[in-house]
Amino acid sequence: MIGDDIAAISTAPGEGGIAIVRLSGNDVIEKVERIFKPYRAGIKLSDKEGYSLSLGWLCDEKMEIIDEVLLGLMRAPRSYTGEDVVEINCHGGTLPARRCLEAVMWQGVRLAQPGEFTRRAFLNGRLDVSQAEAVIEVIRAKTERGMNLALKQLAGRNSQEINLLEDQMIEVNAMLEASLDFPDEVGDLDYSAAQGKLQEVKNRIDKLLLAGERAEIYREGINVAICGKPNVGKSSLLNALLRKEKAIVTSIPGTTRDIIEDYINIRGIPVKLKDTAGIRSTEDLVERIGIERSQEVISEADLVLFILDVGTGIDQEDRKIYEKIEKKNKIVLVNKEDLEEKNISEAELEQLFPGVKIVRGSIIEETGLEELEESIEKAVLSGQLQSDDMEVMINLRQKNALLTAKRHIEESLAAMGKVSLDCLGVDIWGALEALGEISGKNLKEEVIERIFHDFCIGK
């Protein structure tokens, strides 16, 4: 029930400098005051202004000291939830935070549900639903680029875009209703003007969807598989990109027998990099199992880095491997360019890999790596919106709502002048309702429950 008093530990479990127990509700200030002994005698928490701090001791129900704490007080409506909020900053560690939480629960404060603080912020009008969803995007961001996009959503960028679309759809609906209700005064619907506005909204939705696809890459990241025959430098490339010794590197072919993977940030894109076993014909059972796993990883990868050895040239093994990845999104890396003898020519590369990005370099001397990272970024973002004027992060729920709105608009455009105004109005309202699901104006309770279900306790 909104307004009742809730509490939860808001910091991650484990040892640390401090831990924070957050409380929100109508009576949390009074309840914390009962078990708080300020250092300065005569200071009452209930008399303090918002955005103030108080140092003292937090006690249990018997007024025995639990911990030295710093209380942060935020008064409604200028708090995260829009209600009175108290944050108890205690010593870090599981036990101090748990004891502080138990102490306030003895005063009649209940344990918060996952996402309940943010849900209250939404219900109290502090955040709209798009901003509330951005909170979890900020928490889960894997790179600075992804976090910056989430912060823009939290600041209301998505809401501004949706509000603009809603305003335009309301204008079209007003034109429609005026022609229906006041035909003598207003006259027939100006189909040309209505079509123009609907087309404008549709174009804007298309841009939002494209921008959302690009943001999805920054949020979820991509899987990149490194492949090639044994001893071409796959593990060396993994180590070079990670800037650490993750994979064992030897001159013995077949050293890597299982998938080695790690995360890396390439120009703001979270990349799960997977070093695969060298693909070749072998009688070794363990190596053969590793090769089979490699082929599975390659088939599931968003991008494949295919490595060639300039010293050995392109042989039949290389050609067989390339046949398996020919239809994949790929980059060819010609390695060991530091060798004096080079057995791969530009003409041969152009003939075998037409239209494929070729990067030449030496992993051991770290040449070509910057070009490779740039090529990975371009390959991943190929065809995506590049303009910075439409930077939004769109989740699956919002994407589905936009697609629904777009479908209604397309049906309206197709039916314009062919059906009655009443029938036309059905799709206009359908588009408005779909947009309202993004802004939160038309959200059902079960959808709200689903949105906040994925939040952690204490947020």
UniProtKB/Swiss-Prot annotation:
Subunit composition and interactions: Homodimer. Heterotetramer of two MnmE and two MnmG subunits.
Enzyme class per UniProt: hydrolase
Underlying gene: mnmE
Residue positions binding Mg(2+): 235, 256
Annotated protein name in UniProt: tRNA modification GTPase MnmE
Naturally occurring in which organism (per UniProt): Syntrophomonas wolfei subsp. wolfei (strain DSM 2245B / Goettingen)
Main subcellular location: cytoplasm
CDD domains xrefs: trmE, TrmE_N
Record lineage: Bacteria, Bacillati, Bacillota, Clostridia, Eubacteriales
GO MF, one example: GTPase activity
Amino acids binding (6S)-5-formyl-5,6,7,8-tetrahydrofolate: 22, 87, 126, 459
Domain TrmE-type G: 221-381
GO biological process, alphabetically ordered: tRNA methylation; tRNA wobble uridine modification
Sequence positions that bind GTP: 231-236, 250-256, 275-278
Residues holding K(+): 231, 250, 252, 255
Cofactor(s) needed for function: K(+)
